[in-house]
C-alpha cells in the first residue's frame, strides 16, 4: 500500500528507464521529453492501459533561476538538512519524494552520458565530445559557462516535462 508520493516516485523511476534517449544530428544540447505520452500534460505511465495518475501539474513556474545559480546538488544538501532535523511525517514524506525525484533525474542524466559515450565510440565528432563535456556536471553543479547554463536549463526543463510538470521557463 503505497502513498501517492511513493507511487509517483516509482512511476518516475520507470519513466526515466523507459524513455528513449535521443542525441540528434546537429543539436548542441541534449534532453528530450521523449516518452510518447509526455507530449501530453499527463504522467506518462499506464497500468492495464490506463493512466496511473491522470493529468500532471500544468502552468507552473519552477525556480530554474535558483537551480542555475546553486546547482541541484545544493537542493539535495538542503533536503538532507531538513530530513535530519524534521520530525513531521508529512514533510518528511515530501522531502523523501524530492530526493527520489533527484535520484531519477540523476539516472536520466547517466543514461544521456552513457549514450553520448557510446555514440562517441563510433562517431568521435568534436560536437559530441563538447556536448558530453558540457553535460558532465550540470544541472547538479552551477554552470561555469553560458553553454553549460543553456544545457542545465534545457535538461531541467525537459525532465520537468517528462515527469508531467509543464512549466514555463520564466
Predicted regions and their residues:
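Catalytic cofactor-binding cores of redox enzymes
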Residues: 1-170
Amino acid at each position: 500500500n503505497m502513498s501517492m508520493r511513493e507511487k509517483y516516485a516509482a512511476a518516475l523511476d520507470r519513466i526515466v528507464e523507459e524513455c528513449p534517449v535521443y542525441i540528434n544530428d546537429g543539436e548542441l544540447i541534449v534532453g528530450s521529453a521523449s516518452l510518447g505520452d509526455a507530449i501530453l500534460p499527463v504522467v506518462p505511465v499506464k497500468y492495464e492501459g490506463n493512466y496511473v495518475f491522470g493529468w500532471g501539474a500544468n502552468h507552473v513556474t519552477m525556480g530554474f533561476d535558483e537551480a542555475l545559480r546553486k546547482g541541484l546538488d545544493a537542493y539535495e544538501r538542503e533536503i538532507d538538512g531538513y530530513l535530519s532535523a524534521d520530525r513531521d511525517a508529512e514533510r518528511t514524506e515530501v522531502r523523501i519524494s524530492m530526493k527520489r525525484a533527484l535520484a531519477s533525474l540523476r539516472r536520466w542524466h547517466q543514461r544521456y552520458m552513457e549514450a553520448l559515450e557510446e555514440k562517441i565510440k563510433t562517431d568521435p565528432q568534436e560536437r559530441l565530445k563538447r556536448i558530453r563535456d558540457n553535460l558532465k556536471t550540470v544541472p547538479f553543479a552551477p554552470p561555469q559557462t553560458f553553454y553549460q547554463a543553456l544545457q542545465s536549463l534545457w535538461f531541467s526543463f525537459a525532465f520537468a516535462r517528462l515527469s508531467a510538470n509543464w512549466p514555463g521557463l520564466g
